[in-house]
Amino acid sequence: MNGYVDFSPSPTSPTQEPGEPQPTQAVLQEDVDMSSGSSGNENCSTGRDSQGSDCDDSGKELRMLVESSNTHPSPDDTFRLMMTEAEHNPSTSGCSSEQSAKADAHKELIRTLRELKVHLPADKKAKGKASTLATLKYALRSVKQVKANEEYYQLLMSSESQPCSVDVPSYTMEQVEGITSEYIVKNSDMFAVAVSLVSGKILYISNQVAPIFHCKKDAFSDAKFVEFLAPHDVSVFHSYTTPYKLPPWSVSSGLDSFTQECMEEKSFFCRVSVGKHHENEIRYQPFRMTPYLVKVQEQKGAASQLCCLLLAERVHSGYEAPRIPPEKRIFTTTHTPNCLFQDVDERAVPLLGYLPQDLIETPVLVQLHPSDRPLMLAIHKKILQASGQPFDYSPIRFRTRNGEYITLDTSWSSFINPWSRKISFIIGRHKVRVGPLNEDVFAASPCPEEKTPHPSVQELTEQIHRLLMQPVPHSGSSGYGSLGSNGSHEHLMSQTSSSDSNGQEESHWRRSGIFKTSGKSQSKSHFSPESGGQKEASVAEMQSSPPAQVRSVTTMERDSSGASLPKASFPEELTYKSQPPCSYQQISCLDSVIRYLESCNEAATLKRKCEFPANIPSRKATVSPGLHSGEAARSSKVTSHTEVSAHLSSLALPGKAESVVSLTSQCSYSSTIVHVGDKKPQPELETVEDVASGPESQDDAAGGLSQEKGSLQKLGLTKEVLAAHTQREEQGFLQRFREVSRLGALQAHCQNYLQERSRAPASDRGLRNASGIESSWKKTGKNRKLKSKRVKTRDSSESTGSGGPVSHRPPLVGLNATAWSPSDTSQSSCPSAPFPAPVPAYPLPVFPAPGIVSTPGTVVAPPAAAHTGFTMPVVPMGTQPEFAVQPLPFAAPLAPVMAFMLPSYPFPPATPNLPQAFFPSQPHFPAHPTLASEITPASQAEFPSRTSMLRQPCACPVTPPAGTVALGRASPPLFQSRGSSPLQLNLLQLEEAPESSTGAAGTLGTTGTAASGLDCTSGASRDRQPKAPPTCSEPSDTQNSDAISTSSDLLNLLLGEDLCSATGSALSRSGASATSDSLGSSSLGCDTSRSGAGSSDTSHTSKYFGSIDSSENNHKAKMITDTEESEQFIKYVLQDPIWLLMANTDDNIMMTYQLPSRDLQAVLKEDQEKLKLLQRSQPHFTEGQRRELREVHPWVHTGGLPTAIDVTGCVYCESEEKGNLCLPYEEDSPSLGLCDTSEAKEEESGQLANPRKEAQT
């Protein structure tokens, strides 16, 4: 009947069930109202059921029911009818009383059916009419749901055993009334109710409920609260009142703003009704409810039970008084690609009339005006094109609950899955432009809702779904929280710049402007439509910028006259421009990358191995010659500080000739950044530039942070408190990043160093000729010409830039040549000079290369007043096997002389004399017994007759004057040219802080290109011959060596390693090489036996500096400049060999970054134990996954490695005949104890691992 004819009644069909519930109004109301199964307009019964034909139909159906009952009587039905009659008509007068009982039962049944039909939801009605069968089915299902809910409550409380009741406050009924009255007394539309979580009954309800529902308070006594809820909202009420989800009432005490926000977030919406406002209509009113967990005692002395205390506030239409202001009529929605509502903002409730649960999981298109539905296809096409960027679109009309339409101004965006690059959901931001005609949006709709969507709606939904299943194309930004890369175009810039420092800076300069533009475009509005276009335009502009500008700047730099544009001008411009602020995640991510690269030896050596001399000319003249020394130092400091902290080499370009952290080269490092989202407009590429650009940019950075804070507020973050906290965290991290900047102390010490040098008298600087110094710093052009004549192999020592010509800046003693440019170390035409030192200095001959002597126009330091009592042998051209001893006085100490200096130790009164056997023009001086050593010739083939002459002891007076201390300051500033890693910079910082030797000697050994050699051709060929590593060490600036360099045999290994990364143009056993090798061996007092080294020792210290892991030194090491501490050194001077002296020295005297030696096996054992502990928390493959892997990869089953990567040879050795460029690093084949295979391979590559292992023991 009425669409339900096909339903065949079962023995338990509703035809036999209507008497099951007691025919009283309360029980019927309980049976129906407690239902949660309907999802329609349960509150909009219009009373049609009681009119005309519907009443007739009900009467007919009821007569059929009664006849059926009489025809097929059942004992239960007869008994129930008799009991009902007995209750209502207690007469026992035989047959008449029985007839009257049937009549009364018939009337009661009709009333009950009518009551049930009122509660039947609209979607359950057939053709707008409520049939009796459908009504009885709905009543039966409601009864079952009520029973299930009661069982659920009991099961929930028993299973939980009330775990959260420990800290729950307990109140009596009077106390509950007292604590709730202060919140509800101010609002007449608010009431409080306490519902038992055990029985579901109302234990307490405030008096305000009577005027709100226009009923007596007794109507709620001994009743379940869900009886008054709309059936569709019962499940919502249960989900939000689960005990473990409820906050205790104590959190509401005080009610500050933050707690109030939390209270609002915990709230939910339900419709409540007490009874019928009209005879045939139940009208529900929407309430916003905030639940809390309390314990309530019903009676004194009784056990308290857990209750849900609800603060319920009625929600009014946003268009009725008090109206929501038009500018605040904004809400947001999200829907899935198949156009189903996923989330609805609670602000939509008073504007649309729907509760959130009414719209979620319902089609979006159904709620739109039929004429506006086709617009959604165009909107979603643009959503796909925008790639997550917000944009505005034309207004649409949205239907409210009362059936009216409101006009919305919409903005759309989307969230893109970063893995699949597909749209996960669409975000809509809507503002009401035109309100409804009927301002009561909660009123019932006069027209019934569509039960099934229109076919056009279904077709349109399918089109949109197919459209959004396409992957989103990559663009400048990827929308809300997606992980697309904003810096992907950086690799193009890196390739066009060819590692030229100015090219990189120019590209960096262009990037800064572009990113400022994009930042402004994004910060204008949260939904700015043109921001995506500007971003794409900026990327296109960057990619189309010609590399000719880079090449032109590089060409200017290659002019040896020094008249090119100073490189420091670019970073200074960047410094004074306002930099975009960086997020906490970006800076911390970049800092992690920097620290990783600093500690990665393999990355450093790979970079040096891939470097070619062709890139050298791009690193000249960081300071214009016209600049004052102070300005030059300042600009150099700014440049270096910026670059060391921020610029990293691109890991994606292995062929780039940059070091790990290069001082004067600006490199792209976008490939090393883990992108953390595009919520902030500025990319990660400028992360640390404003942090490390010096004190000038701190104000700008602070201003940028304040601007960003303002922009964040405009962007409309969800919580202002969270935004403010985020800004504070960013600023704090930024400040800490400045404080721990690795060049902070270096800048200060360099500034003091320059100031002291400027105050030092000219007499303290020795007999130097300024022109000679200048010439030595201007010899870059000739050195490059000489380099072009030599075989060019991979070079690491020339990866950093050199300083421009600055007056009174001789090379620094003890620095490795690779830390300096050829202009610093290529003093090939300048002979070596002595340097007074508390331990013997050994000036050895320099053999000038033929190119330097014969080439006209070479700038050579002119001889000046002869240094007292000193001569220097110089080998003329063509005299290779013999020493030609001839005096060569000169003013400036420029040649590679090695001396061991102690901090602040005064110099001897006169220069030490050289052995007569080696320098016939000089007298003998007695040899110190503890410092006797032997010096081997540079090459037995080269000097067969001079071996015995070199084995001479040397000593030095120990009564030095104090007047020559200022010579320790005669070195070039730190930022003219530096090494290839922050570790080397720290070591250089520690070298220059004490007033140690700098003036009387150049570097430890010049580069092979500039070092005076015997024959270019033969030297280059000999350099390729594999030779045994020299067993000598470099004792210069011993206070700067760590524990690894305390013994000569360890440094022998380090120097042997250096053969692998020596400069390709190094001459075999050049004078400078002989100097550093021989002196290193002699000063340490170790007897050496060498077969000759085929490379310049200039890169020994480069390898030493560059390969030390950052964990082996303390970045915060304090320089020992105090005189009292340095005086403690005097008692140890010249008493023992240096290794014994260092072993017996107190810890407070030794450098703080030295680490005690550790047993390698013990360290590995500890690491293996830690790894075993960590293995439990590591992810493991399941058996199914392992089976799949074995099927695909057979090598998994064997437990070994695939043949493609199972390489046992040295991957860094290109050829044994081409220089044996292997990298003996333990890090190359780490033994983690994970399998025996790696350990076996480590043993196989013995020469790779053994030197480093022995060094660490």
Curated annotation (Swiss-Prot):
It comes from the Eukaryota. InterPro entries: PAS, PAS-like_dom_sf, PAS_fold_3, Per1-3_PAS-A, Period_circadian-like_C, Period_circadian_regulator. Residues 510-709 are annotated as: CSNK1E binding domain. Expressed in all tissues examined including eye, brain, heart, lung, spleen, liver, pancreas and kidney. In the CNS, highly expressed in the SCN, internal granular layer of granular cells of the olfactory bulb, tuberculum olfactorium, piriform cortex, gyrus dentatus of the hippocampus, cerebellum, pars tuberalis/median eminence, and pituitary, and moderately in the tenia tecta, caudate putamen, accumbens nucleus, superior and inferior colliculus and pineal gland. GO terms for biological process: chromatin remodeling; circadian regulation of gene expression; circadian rhythm; entrainment of circadian clock by photoperiod; fatty acid metabolic process; gluconeogenesis; glycogen biosynthetic process; lactate biosynthetic process. One of its GO terms (molecular function) is transcription corepressor binding. Its main location: nucleus. A motif (Nuclear localization signal) lies at residues 778-794. It is found in: Nucleus; Cytoplasm; Cytoplasm, Perinuclear region. SUPFAM superfamilies: PYP-like sensor domain (PAS domain). A motif (Nuclear export signal 1) lies at residues 109-118. GO terms for cellular component: Cry-Per complex; cytoplasm; cytosol; nucleoplasm; nucleus; perinuclear region of cytoplasm. PROSITE patterns: PAS. A motif (Nuclear export signal 2) lies at residues 460-469. Residues 1157-1257 are annotated as: CRY binding domain. Residues 393-436 form the PAC domain. Acetylated. Deacetylated by SIRT1, resulting in decreased protein stability. Deacetylated by SIRT6, preventing its degradation by the proteasome, resulting in increased protein stability. Phosphorylated by CSNK1E and CSNK1D. Phosphorylation results in PER2 protein degradation. May be dephosphorylated by PP1. A motif (Nuclear export signal 3) lies at residues 983-990. Residues 779-792 have a biased composition (Basic residues). This is Period circadian protein homolog 2. It comes from Rattus norvegicus (Rat). The gene is Per2.
